[in-house]
């Protein structure tokens, strides 16, 4: 398996033994250090920044590391799609965004439904190890852990001889207090309502019997398909009698950007996801195709 794991294409759940995961690896200093010091283990980085992904891949290639993997996706969905329950040995979160404003707390990495997903995938005895410079974030995380009732909690201030990153080194040199929180899984978490998407084996094109296509009917539309499920269209391109529609689907926070093609056939048009769009096949993606067909009918 290559360093970069395309979660939409790879066989899931992944089969990578002795696996530890870092969420939000940034420059990649920590995950590379772990991989070099522990050649008998495998390390998986999950990161939403494409630039960070590319930088890590270059570093891994230059150092010849064979035990580092990464993917470009939101951490919750990375765990949801890629790992089976009780599989990951340890999870690392180094200075996650604390999202200071109260109205943004729902974006925090350790809100209960996200922490629930991480706990489900963590082995019994495994640990979620968090470093933060924000004490309020630490307290928030402890409250989320209480909801799940599956962790032994250990906390304290950091006193490190070897900083993980240049930022940690800078903060320590400034005398800033840094905190650590270890959540050790001792039993299965209590159930918490959490986002899910329904995958399907295949997507089916939809045929509409119309003489012509009016782009204004489908351009710049926003349609609610279900609770917390929204389908948006943007620009429409035309080439001869065929069309290409720029689209976005948001399912419980899981985002997919793709194109829908509208191709002329003898007695109408066939609507399908463009073969150049890489998508995760979901029930709501099929509904998106059907929605475009309805707009044209």
Curated annotation (Swiss-Prot):
Which residues are responsible for catalysis?
97
State the pathway, as annotated in the record.
tRNA modification; N(7)-methylguanine-tRNA biosynthesis
Q: Which PROSITE patterns match?
A: SAM_MT_TRMB
Q: Name one GO cellular component term.
A: tRNA methyltransferase complex
Q: Which UniProt keywords apply?
A: Methyltransferase, S-adenosyl-L-methionine, Transferase, tRNA processing
The organism's place on the tree of life at top rank: Bacteria
Reactions catalysed, semicolon-separated, are: guanosine(46) in tRNA + S-adenosyl-L-methionine = N(7)-methylguanosine(46) in tRNA + S-adenosyl-L-homocysteine
Spell out the SUPFAM superfamilies in the cross-references: S-adenosyl-L-methionine-dependent methyltransferases
One molecular function GO term is:
tRNA (guanine(46)-N7)-methyltransferase activity
Question: Which residues participate in substrate binding?
Answer: 101, 133, 165-168
Q: List, alphabetically, the HAMAP family matched.
A: tRNA_methyltr_TrmB
Q: What is known of its domains?
A: The C-terminal region is probably involved in protein stability.
Q: Which PANTHER family would you find in this protein's record?
A: 3-DEOXY-D-MANNO-OCTULOSONIC-ACID TRANSFERASE/TRNA GUANINE-N 7 - -METHYLTRANSFERASE, PENTACOTRIPEPTIDE-REPEAT REGION OF PRORP DOMAIN-CONTAINING PROTEIN
Q: Name the chain's protein.
A: tRNA (guanine-N(7)-)-methyltransferase
Give the lineage.
Bacteria, Pseudomonadati, Aquificota, Aquificia, Aquificales
């Amino acid at each position: 398996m290559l360093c970069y794991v395309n979660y939409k294409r790879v066989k899931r759940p992944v089969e990578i033994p002795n696996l530890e995961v870092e969420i939000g690896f940034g420059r990649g200093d920590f995950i590379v250090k772990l991989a070099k010091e522990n050649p008998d283990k495998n390390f998986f980085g999950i990161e939403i920044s494409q630039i960070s992904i590319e930088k890590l891949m270059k570093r891994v290639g230059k150092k010849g590391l064979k035990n580092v993997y990464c993917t470009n996706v939101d951490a919750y969905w990375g765990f949801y799609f890629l790992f089976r329950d009780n599989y990951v040995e340890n999870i690392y979160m180094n200075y996650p965004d604390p999202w200071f404003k109260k109205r943004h707390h729902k974006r925090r990495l350790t809100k209960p439904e996200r922490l629930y997903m991480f706990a489900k995938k963590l082995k019994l005895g495994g640990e979620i190890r968090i470093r933060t410079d924000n004490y309020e974030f630490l307290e928030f995380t402890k409250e989320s852990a209480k909801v799940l009732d599956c962790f032994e909690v250990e906390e304290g201030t950091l006193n490190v001889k070897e900083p993980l990153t240049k930022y940690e080194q800078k903060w320590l040199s400034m005398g800033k207090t840094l905190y650590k929180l270890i959540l050790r899984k001792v039993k299965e978490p209590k159930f918490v309502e959490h986002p899910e998407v329904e995958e399907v084996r295949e997507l089916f094109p939809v045929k509409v019997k119309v003489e012509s296509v009016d782009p204004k009917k489908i351009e710049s539309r926003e349609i609610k398909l279900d609770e917390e499920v929204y389908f948006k269209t943007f620009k429409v391109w035309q080439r001869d009698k065929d069309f290409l529609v720029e689209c976005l689907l948001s399912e419980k926070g899981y985002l997919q950007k793709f194109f829908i093609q509208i191709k002329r056939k003898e007695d109408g048009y066939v609507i399908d996801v463009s073969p150049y769009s890489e998508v995760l096949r979901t029930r709501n993606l099929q509904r998106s195709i059907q929605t475009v067909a309805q707009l044209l009918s």
